[in-house]
Amino acid sequence: MTVAQPLVLLAAGGTGGHLFPAEALALRLRDRGIRVVLASDGRVEALSGGFPASEIVSIPSATPSGRSPLARGAAFLTLGRGFAAAIRAVRRLNPAVVVGFGGYPTVPPLLAAQMLRVPTLLHEQNAVMGRANGFLARGASVIATGFSEVRGVPARAGARRVHTGNPVRPAVLAAADTPYPALSPDGPLNLLAFGGSQGARVMSEVVPEAVARLPAPLRARLHVVQQARAEDLARAEAIYGRAGLASASVAPFFKDLPARMAAAHLVVARSGASTVAELAVIGRPAILVPLPGSLDQDQAANAAVLGAAGAAFPRPQTDFIPERLAADLEALFGAPERLAAAAAAARRTGIPDAAERLAALVVETAIAASTR
């Protein structure tokens, strides 16, 4: 990068799905000697511990959703306050590039940068472009995508699209060095269930009940690791305690989740972009249950990509009930060659160097802008 004292401003919503790829990019940029500042909303404090940024700027934000005119009006007022704060931040920081990772918290910083004629790069993690990124796409210098095909990219923005893949954290890359665990007729079976950085109650409602319905010889071989919300822990632990499992570990959050993915023979999870990217890079088969009710249906699209590749087994939440999950688990654990094939297919879809690809694109964008 040719600009003096280079600085890149990253804008990401305060959930793991947005912060994890931003963190992976920040590490690569820092390795290149580039200063990184993170702009996000108030939720970031709970998840940003150790984020590799020299500064974290809190920008007021809200999502204008729902049918209430008052609620939507209040959300737009908050976004307006965020835009004013973002204008001040962009002027003060004078970044070479502003990179957005989607979600409404990124709208004020990206829109401020575009109005101040600072180059902007959007990263769309999902197989369907989100509404915030769609709104910002026309003014973006470059659009990077996690999937090779992304629905909903504005036609005029398509020529500026570059497929980089979804950046994953160093812990995921380290876990990817672990081969798929061998399966034997009487050996251990490792099942991991989680619902993303914010948890998912449906996992606690369905997975323990499904496991309890498995044949006793299968349960005796089963080692379960499950993420559950704090209010669901006691119920899940009680069901597992009565099920006669080889072992069960239930907790609200696992800091070493990538390592636990690597140890799993099968994963049951939502299909957020970061989860899908991590499963692919590590190379683990999964039963994916897309989050229902989304206007964009992005998780369904993400799951469909892995399903089409033979790397995952998508299940709509309407079909995600204990009886059907138990049947899926029994069938898959009874077909080790099918699980191994899905693991290999998952690894083929992964892009382990996505963070480096995206970092190179950020630098190229800054250089192109500085030479105009």
Curated annotation (Swiss-Prot):
One of its GO terms (molecular function) is undecaprenyldiphospho-muramoylpentapeptide beta-N-acetylglucosaminyltransferase activity. It is found in: Cell inner membrane. UDP-N-acetyl-alpha-D-glucosamine binds at residues 15-17, 126, 169, 197, 299. The keyword Membrane applies. It is a peripheral membrane protein. Transmembrane segments: none annotated. Its EC number is 2.4.1.227. Pathway: Cell wall biogenesis; peptidoglycan biosynthesis. Keywords: Cell cycle, Cell division, Cell inner membrane, Cell membrane, Cell shape, Cell wall biogenesis/degradation, Glycosyltransferase, Membrane, Peptidoglycan synthesis, Transferase. It is an enzyme of class 2 (transferase). Its main location: membrane. The keyword Transmembrane does not apply. GO terms for cellular component: plasma membrane. It catalyses: di-trans,octa-cis-undecaprenyl diphospho-N-acetyl-alpha-D-muramoyl-L-alanyl-D-glutamyl-meso-2,6-diaminopimeloyl-D-alanyl-D-alanine + UDP-N-acetyl-alpha-D-glucosamine = di-trans,octa-cis-undecaprenyl diphospho-[N-acetyl-alpha-D-glucosaminyl-(1->4)]-N-acetyl-alpha-D-muramoyl-L-alanyl-D-glutamyl-meso-2,6-diaminopimeloyl-D-alanyl-D-alanine + UDP + H(+). Belongs to the glycosyltransferase 28 family. MurG subfamily. Cell wall formation. Catalyzes the transfer of a GlcNAc subunit on undecaprenyl-pyrophosphoryl-MurNAc-pentapeptide (lipid intermediate I) to form undecaprenyl-pyrophosphoryl-MurNAc-(pentapeptide)GlcNAc (lipid intermediate II). This is UDP-N-acetylglucosamine--N-acetylmuramyl-(pentapeptide) pyrophosphoryl-undecaprenol N-acetylglucosamine transferase. It comes from Methylobacterium sp. (strain 4-46). The gene is murG.
